Amino acid sequence: MAAFQTAAQLARAVQSGETTPQQLLHGALARAEAVRGLNALVSLNSHAEEQAAAVQGRMQAGETLPLAGVPIVVKDNINVTGTRTTCGSRMLANYVSPYTATAAQKLQGAGAVIVGKANMDEFAMGSSTESSASGPTLNPWDHERVPGGSSGGSAVAVAAGISPVSLGSDTGGSVRQPAALCGVYGFKPTYGRVSRYGLVAYASSLDQIGPFARSAEDLALLMNVIAGHDPRDATSLDAPARFAVGGADSLRGLRVGVIRESLGGNTPGVEAALGATLDALRGAGAVVGEVSIPELEYAIAAYYLIAMPEASSNLARYDGMVYGERVPGGDVTRSMTLTREQGFGQEVQRRILLGTYALSSGYYDAYYAKAMKVRRLIADEFTTAFGQYDVLVTPTSPFPAFRRGEKASDPLAMYAADVDTVAVNLAGLPALSVPAGFEEVDGKRLPVGVQFIAPALQDERLLALAGALEAVGAVQLEMPQD
């Protein structure tokens, strides 16, 4: 496989007989080995060869497969039958999944071949992919810096050319932020648009599977495959849609609202990229204005006061009795204590403790219940803003990739990395990070992203916008040097 070809190009090559699924798989594996030092993947799919052969057989039998032979990487919290699903944790170091997540199953049904599982922050709790039990993932643009998180491995797999597309999960920005820091597209669909069945839960009311890609066409291609109602997920929406890219003409008259609260505290490179993107939109005939969403001031606090309690509940099942690596301790209580002490990393333990505290008697109303009220206010303010504008825009992250270890010992600084993304999850909206430029830091060019937000169930509007931005030259997509 020629690194950095798009999924659409590879699928067409297989469909025309120019190449085979097996050849694409071998190319992806060779590329994964070449960039092994980035630590993007935590495991390879031992069944990939037979899956590639099966795709070839289906093609020969006359099946039309939109992702024919396309190699793909999925985050290590998305279950795939017969592969380890560790969630970046010692707790699940040897867990082999007996079933496949709906999103991954749909990819395989469309002809994709799952190459392996991508590294991640432990249980998706982080913004840097430093807390994984498999070690940190490195940013391909500067190996001394983080790729973002928690889906850092999925972002790096696409940015470094292992696979043209990948799947991650986004609870508070975990697809969009690493996409921005690695210079690729990252899309968070409307909550419920993609089934969560088979996704290991972090915060169930916020989690959403989403794709990474190097082209707008590939985003649309993946969403046409993975979106749709799933009776196995009670939060899944029955809202059929056809995803397609738009042309430059679609920007004429588009109402774009810049969220005023996102304009402070950004680095010069982020400000420049946002400004250039807005100039391109104006030049193509879009109407650009500003809109205020005052309650965003409380988004980070509300997000963590909701996510942490949900995490404390979801992770209660890992006690070594049914789930998790059991540590013997004499009696059951001691064994459970040791299992959780040794199985969970520091950040996961911190969030479980804070979440349990926020739900405890006497504090529930003061913290969790109040955060839920703020969540409702934020959602209402977004609805009001969409009465004036078709899409809203912010930086994806206020800064480019930071150095490894720079924020690891300062939880509040790490949490602030999600300042532009968490509100979208609180409101359940779709959002897209577009690679929008670069900022030079210490002699290295680091990618930055711009985030576009649409009303609920208007996901296709964002993918059409991505294609239009490509058409007017507003997307800055480059390949990092090995």
Curated annotation (Swiss-Prot):
Give the keywords, sorted: ATP-binding, Ligase, Nucleotide-binding, Protein biosynthesis
Q: Which gene encodes it?
A: gatA
What protein name applies here? Glutamyl-tRNA(Gln) amidotransferase subunit A
- Gene3D superfamilies, from UniProt? Amidase signature (AS) domain
**Recorded GO terms, molecular function?**
ATP binding; glutaminyl-tRNA synthase (glutamine-hydrolyzing) activity
Task: Describe the family membership recorded for this protein in Swiss-Prot or TrEMBL.
Answer: Belongs to the amidase family. GatA subfamily.
Q: Where is the active site?
A: K75, S150, S174
The set of disulfide-linked cysteines is none
Q: What EC number(s) does its UniProt record assign?
A: 6.3.5.7
